[in-house]
Amino acid sequence: LFRSLLVDEAHNLVERGREMYSARLVKEDFLAVKKIVKAMERHEKRPEVHYILRKFEKSLEAANRVLLAWKRECDEFEVISDAGMLEFALLRVAGDYELVAKEYPVLPERDTILSLYFDVRRFLAVLEKFDESDRIYLDYDEERKFRIKIQCMDPSGCLKEVMERVQSTIFFSATLLPIRYYKEQLGGEKEDA
């Protein structure tokens, strides 16, 4: 079966690729979810579910502590070499959330909790593929909220991995110049036309 990948507006793919293979977490999101979980704990009567909620709260606190330590050392912007202990804390957050979700098919403030869960999952997925083309940095957003971001600097490896799953890839764009730059950034090889 002949399979082709058609990419329109290919000049945008480099920047989109950087964003697709990047992820960020905001420290204050962990505190917001922790507050919700504490309120759930206060109202929970089932001891086994109370235990699960408490465990989830502790994993949120552990992730928050790692972020807080970095926040204290970061004035405006700092590049770090790895996510260190945060990765383990995030694995716990994700696993503990899944236990809570089994007990609460309808979560209070569901959107806030799910948003953090999906951000954590995305961060872990991007972190799993972390290589020399990525950077991890700490900074503050426009509202002065502290965040950690894995930034894909060169998406060519990830894009090439996708393109290797098909027989051919055709890029459409009126502005793929300079051609060598785009060829390199889009995962092209020397022999590619």
Predicted regions and their residues:
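Conserved coupling segment at the C-terminus of the helicase ATP-binding
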Residues: 2-193
